[in-house]
Amino acid sequence: MIKIAFFDVDGTLLNIGSKELSDKTSFALKELRRNHVLLCMATGRGYLSVPHFEGIAFDVLLTFNGSYVKAGEKIIFKNPLEQDDKNRIIENLKNMNRAIAISNEHFIVTNGTDPDLEQYFAFGSETMKIAPDFDDLCDEDIYQIMCSCRKEEYEQILQGTNKTQITAWWDKAVDIIPLACGKGNAVNAVLAHYGFSKEEAIAFGDGKNDIEMLEAVGTGVAMENAKDEVKQRADAICKSVEEDGVYDYCVRNHLIAAMD
């Protein structure tokens, strides 16, 4: 019996760049909740950037790709970047002449801009805020660093760090988080918090940063619009986000009744 459902946001619940759920996706979430299934939003977005959908209350917010997780008002998991690693990454990116974004539960700011980073923010309907005091803010706890880059640059960005990893849902920008985080580890923390087994959980996702989440639950469902690498690691594949894949899967697998 499914007791909790984890959902990626962009490319899973929402079309990339969209702000509103489709009617069927909204219905599916409400029906799952009515059927006593807990809802967890599992996103690479920062805590301040999570979308809010009318009439839908998520029981858990898994943000920063799993670096900061809240169940209601209770923080059940948090793990900022280690100071030395954070400083080294920022130094590496400055040497590469990259604009850098940093974020925690209180702010999300940048030290500059470039087209790919702007598009990254635009996908989440966010505006980049360039902070004059960026270097001072870097001394705060930081859960995620974001920058534009390509896969062949990953090693250069992480050079000299010990406990960091790159996770990506787009091929032109990345999220840099602690090695001990990621959506999979955060899912495990959520399941432990509620006393649920892996088999009592289902997850939906489309990005490479969703793979470990899909593998951490009993049923990992990849969207049809996901990359092949994600589909190969999933237990099932549903229709695309444009075709209301979450709704269709939940109806076909008797998690909810169909809309009238």
Description of each model-found segment:
Residues K3-S18:
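Asp-based phosphoryl-transfer active-site loop
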Residues N92, M96-A216, N225:
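Conserved acidic, metal-coordinating active-site core of Asp-based
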Residues M1-F7, K30, R34:
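Non-catalytic pre-domain segments flanking phosphatase-related domains
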Residues I56-A57, N65, G160-K163, A216-V217, ...:
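Short, structured coil segments at secondary-structure junctions
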Residues A216, V221-D260:
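Asp-based, Mg2+/Mn2+-dependent phosphohydrolase catalytic module
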Residues I16, E20-D116:
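Active-site phosphate-binding/coordination module
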Residues F58-G66, A122, I166-W169, V221-E224, ...:
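Short hydrophobic/aromatic-enriched beta-strand-loop microsegments
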Residues L32, N65, I145, V187, ...:
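Residue-level signal for inorganic ion chemistry
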